[in-house]
Design a protein with these regions (language model features):
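Membrane-water interface segments at the C-terminal ends of transmembrane alpha-helices
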Residues: 38-45, 82-84, 153-183, 199-201
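Hydrophobic alpha-helical transmembrane segments of membrane transport/permease proteins
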Residues: 31-80, 174, 178-192
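An internal, D/E-rich "acidic patch" concept
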Residues: 72-130
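Juxtamembrane/transmembrane-helix interface segments of polytopic membrane transporters
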Residues: 34, 38-42, 167, 171-175, ...
């Protein structure tokens, strides 16, 4: 019996590893095609885009610049060189943002700020969105459902209005009414983080509130909830010990994805 159990466990592990390898392989192939497509599309833009002072350059200088960038080579050769350098950790140098500064240096300076913003926004989103989802689910069981309606209105607003609109609104409101600084720099005070963190957390607040409310409402229709209610267990106890715990399990799978989306979104905020 023990041997069969071990073989079954080993088989499950192997199947899971095979599944993970398949998913990772597909993701890498997709990433390869996306990067290649973007690379090829970027190479189709006019030559003027590669020079900040194109109108002041002679034809010979333009040709020399194109040769220096390697743009005179066939597209497959350029793509192969790009992947070769990228695998070595060489992403080239900036020609417009910061002239002749390695891209890896620029990223090394900016990524810590993006990660800090993303982590702070995620913590705020969970601290607000999860209680909001709980309150909406509890309000859904009342007669007037006021809290559920207000929360639903907030979620619909955040999802319907373009992010740039309420980013701008928060920026104007925070700077004019509360006199909050708008720039985050290495020497900025903690107040400079309020506007970007709040702006980044709003989509995830709505996201967590919406899904947690849905899962909790679904749990209230289960048989174990009816049984606990029939036994006279308090509604708050059922909500806290049973409904919330079971409803929060599906939420965990969304946290990594939402964190990545938050970090990517911080580029716009910054």
């Amino acid at each position: 019996p023990f041997g069969n159990g071990r073989e079954e466990t080993t088989g499950r592990i192997l199947r899971m590893l095979k599944y993970l390898a398949k998913r990772i392989g597909r993701s890498l192939i997709t990433l390869f095609f996306i990067i290649s497509l973007v690379f090829c599309l970027m190479r189709q833009m006019p030559v003027e885009g590669y020079f900040t002072n194109y109108d002041k350059l002679t034809a010979a200088q333009v040709q020399a610049g194109i040769a220096q960038l390697g743009l005179d080579k066939p597209l497959p050769v350029q793509l192969a060189r790009f992947y070769r350098d990228a695998l070595r950790g060489d992403l080239g140098v900036s020609h417009i943002y910061r002239t002749n500064v390695p891209v890896t240096t620029i990223l090394a300076e900016k990524i810590p700020v993006s990660l800090k913003l993303g982590i702070a926004a995620m913590l705020l989103a969970m601290a607000v969105g999860i209680p909001m989802g709980i309150l909406m689910a509890r309000s859904n069981r009342t007669r007037h459902k006021l809290g559920d309606k207000l929360g639903t209105g907030f979620i619909v607003f955040i999802q319907a209005v373009p992010a740039a609109v309420y980013y701008l609104f928060l920026q104007l409101l925070g700077s004019d009414l509360f006199h909050l600084p708008m720039l985050v720099t290495g020497s900025a005070t903690w107040m400079a983080w309020i506007l970007p963190v709040v702006s980044l957390s709003l989509p995830n607040i709505a996201y967590y509130g919406m899904w947690l409310r849905r899962y909790m409402v679904d749990e209230t229709t289960k048989d174990y909830v009816r049984l606990a209610t029939a036994k006279g267990v308090k509604s708050s106890t059922i909500m806290r010990r049973h409904i919330f715990r079971n409803a929060f399990v599906p939420m965990v799978q969304y946290i990594p994805t939402s964190f990545l989306n938050t970090v990517v979104g911080s580029i716009y905020i910054e």
